[in-house]
C-alpha cells in the first residue's frame, strides 16, 4: 500500500492511504529503514503494511531540515502588519529558506485591520510579483482566489508565532485548534502548534508546524543566500564577476551596487541581504 505520512508522535507514524484517504495510525518504521539509518518525516510518500510497518520511503522532491517536512507543493508565508509588527528582515528570512529549495511562495498578510497603511508596507514585494493576499481573520473570510490557489496542493504554513496562522487554519478548514493571543510583555506570540502535521479537508491539505523559533537556517549555503533574493536576479547577470557576492566588490564591478545607488533596489532589502551574509560568516542563525 502507498501512502503519505501526515503526523509523527513519539516514533509512531500516522499514514493516509493515497487511494481512499483512509488514515492508518501508529505505524512503525521497519527494521530495514533503521538499518539504513533512514528516518521518515511528515510529507514522505511511503509503502506500508496496514497493521504494521513502513517499508519504503520514496525519493523526496524537496525537504526542510527543521521543521522536518518533505514534498511541499507551495509555502504559505504568514506575516502580520501589527502585533507582532511587520518586519521585512523576518519576511526575507522565511523567503530565503523557502526559495532556496525552489518552493513556490504565497504571502499571507494578516491583521490588516490594525493599520490602514498595510499595502504600502508590502510594495517592494508586490513589485517583484509575489502572490500576496491580505487577510482579516476577524471577518472570517477567505478570498475565493486564495482557495483556488491552495486546492489539490500540499501547502506548508510558516510564520512567526502570533501572526494568525492557527486562526486562518480554523477559518479555512473549519477546525478548532487552540489560539493564543500575543504576549504583551515580549510582543511575541505563544506557541499553539506542538507537532508538525498535515491537516486535510476535502481537496485542501495544509502542513501546520511549530512557530518561528524552531525554524533552521543552517541548511542554507552562501551561494543560496545570494541567489535567493529575487530582487537581485534582474541585475546580477551584469556583474563583472560570476562569483560576485555584491558586498566587497567595487560599485563599477557590481550591478547590484549600481542598482542600489540608482534607487532600483530598496536599501532595506540590501541591508537584509548583508545581514544574512554576516550571519552566515559567523555561522550564527
From Swiss-Prot:
Domain CP-type G stretches: 61-215
GO biological processes: ribosomal small subunit biogenesis
Binding positions for Zn(2+) per the UniProt entry: 239, 244, 246, 254
Quaternary context: Monomer. Associates with 30S ribosomal subunit, binds 16S rRNA.
Names of required cofactors: Zn(2+)
Gene Ontology cellular-component terms listed: cytoplasm
Secretion signal, residue range per the UniProt entry: none
EC nos: 3.6.1.-
Cofactor note: Binds 1 zinc ion per subunit.
PROSITE patterns xrefs: ENGC_GTPASE (PS50936), G_CP (PS51721)
Molecular function GO labels: GTP binding; GTPase activity; metal ion binding; rRNA binding
Binding site for GTP: 110-113, 159-167
SS bonds (residue pairs): none
Protein name (record): Small ribosomal subunit biogenesis GTPase RsgA
Pfam family, one: RsgA_GTPase
Entry keyword set: Cytoplasm, GTP-binding, Hydrolase, Metal-binding, Nucleotide-binding, Ribosome biogenesis, RNA-binding, rRNA-binding, Zinc
Domain of life: Bacteria
Known function: One of several proteins that assist in the late maturation steps of the functional core of the 30S ribosomal subunit. Helps release RbfA from mature subunits. May play a role in the assembly of ribosomal proteins into the subunit. Circularly permuted GTPase that catalyzes slow GTP hydrolysis, GTPase activity is stimulated by the 30S ribosomal subunit.
Cellular compartment(s): Cytoplasm
Main location: cytoplasm
Family: Belongs to the TRAFAC class YlqF/YawG GTPase family. RsgA subfamily.
The protein's enzyme class: hydrolase
